[in-house]
Structures are given as C-alpha cells and as structure tokens.
Amino acid sequence: MSTQSTHPPKPEAPRLPPAISSCQRRHTLPASEFRCLTPEDAVSAFEIEREAFISVLGVCPLYLDEIRHFLTLCPELSLGWFEEGCLVAFIIGSLWDKDRLMQESLTMHRPGGHIAHLHVLAVHCAFRQQGRGPILLWRYLHHLGSQPAVHRAALMCEDALVPFYERFGFHAMGPCAITVGSLSFTELHCSLQGHPFLRRNSGC
C-alpha cells in the first residue's frame, strides 16, 4: 500500500506545505532524520495515510486508534522520515506468528512471532515522486535486519503494486486470506537472511 537507484539524484527541497509547516522550524532540528515513531506521532501519520489511501481505496490500512495501538506495543517495528522535525513518510509494522497473514493480523501484535507484518507505507503528498518510498523501504528492511527476532517481512498489496515490492526482494505467495470490503490482495514475503540490503548501503 504504498523507486530508484542506490544513489538517486537529490531533488530540490520543496517548500513545506501548510499541514507540515505548522511544525515550527528550528535550527536545532536535523534537516532530514529517520527514527522509530512514537504514539505522539500518531496524528501526523494518520493525516498522511488518510490523504494517501481514502481517495484511492476508500479505506485506510490503519485508523488512528490502531496506529496508536501499534506505536505503543511495538514502536521498534516502525520507521519515520522527518524533514525539519516534521513527518513526511513512514512505515508501521507488527510481529506475526503464523506462516501466512490472516484477518487477525490486521490488528494484532504477536511478540513471539518472527514475521514483521508491514501494515502501511505512506508518503506525504508534497514529497511524492521523489524516490522517498523506495529509500524508506530499503532503510526499513535494514532496520528489521538488525533485529534478531525478525526473520521475514510480509505485506499485502494490490496486484498493480507487486512489481514494486519484488524489486526489494519480496516474493508473491499468492492471494492473501485478508479481504477489506470488496478489496482483495496479493500476499508477499521477503526473507531477511542474506538480503541485498545487508551488503548494500541505501545511499541515503
């Protein structure tokens, strides 16, 4: 639900849109920062996600209370990209303990699991078409690879997005058991053992 050489050209930094410029700029804030999200980031994440998904699918992968739920239980399975202290892109995941995703995995975090279920990847509308989604995904996979308990990453997406995720080492497992209303999805898995990101700097 969510492009790009290892060293993509750096586009001219866009002006922060009103929704983002509400975060006051301070010289002490890093121009660009990656970090795990906290429950305090939930509202900003939901605003980005709602704009990205509602107009296209009519639903959000996670709603505000679910975002807070996962950022409270497993913030280490999230990653946000911040510009001047404001969130511009993020991924939220949780652990799952079965071989395949199922309906319960949409809302559950299983601490004993070894599969990181990627619930959502979203980029603020003012920062799209800049290669940020792929960069963030590479960094997230590297982040997961540093966690010994996580052996695989799994996600579900529409068929049109399968080639995008295959570029990062994901493999289609067939139709996903999860449905959302009338929407159906393909399930993809990525082994974190021997993945190229372990031998390759993302160039960010």
UniProtKB/Swiss-Prot annotation:
Q: Which residues bear the site annotation Important for the catalytic mechanism?
A: 117, 119
Induction annotation: Exhibits night/day variations with a 10-fold increased protein levels and activity at night in the pineal gland and a 5-fold increase in the retina. In both tissues, the mRNA levels remain constant.
Q: Where does substrate bind?
A: 121, 156
Q: Which GO terms describe its biological process?
A: cellular response to cAMP; circadian rhythm; melatonin biosynthetic process; N-terminal protein amino acid acetylation; response to light stimulus
Instruction: Tell whether Phosphoprotein is among the UniProt keywords.
Output: yes
**MF-aspect GO terms:** aralkylamine N-acetyltransferase activity
Give residues where Phosphoserine occurs. 202
The reaction(s) this protein catalyses: a 2-arylethylamine + acetyl-CoA = an N-acetyl-2-arylethylamine + CoA + H(+)
According to its UniProt record, the EC number is 2.3.1.87
What's a single GO CC term here? perinuclear region of cytoplasm
Give expression by tissue: Highly expressed in pineal gland and in the photoreceptor outer segments in the retina. Expressed at about 100-fold lower levels in the pituitary gland and testis. Not detected in other tissues.
**Entry PTM:** cAMP-dependent phosphorylation regulates AANAT activity by promoting interaction with 14-3-3 proteins. Phosphorylation levels exhibit night/day variations, with an increase during nighttime.
The positions annotated for binding acetyl-CoA are: 121-123, 129-134, 165-167
| Disulfide feature | none
The subcellular localization recorded is: Cytoplasm
* Residues annotated with Phosphothreonine modification: 28
**Which UniProt key words apply to this protein?**
Acyltransferase, Biological rhythms, Cytoplasm, Melatonin biosynthesis, Phosphoprotein, Transferase
**Chief location:** cytoplasm
Which top-level group of life is the source organism from?
Eukaryota
Family, as annotated = Belongs to the acetyltransferase family. AANAT subfamily.
Assembly behavior: Monomer. Interacts with several 14-3-3 proteins, including YWHAB, YWHAE, YWHAG and YWHAZ, preferentially when phosphorylated at Thr-28. Phosphorylation on Ser-202 also allows binding to YWHAZ, but with lower affinity. The interaction with YWHAZ considerably increases affinity for arylalkylamines and acetyl-CoA and protects the enzyme from dephosphorylation and proteasomal degradation. It may also prevent thiol-dependent inactivation.
Described function: Controls the night/day rhythm of melatonin production in the pineal gland. Catalyzes the N-acetylation of serotonin into N-acetylserotonin, the penultimate step in the synthesis of melatonin.
UniProt-recorded name of the protein: Serotonin N-acetyltransferase
Species name for this entry?
Macaca mulatta (Rhesus macaque)
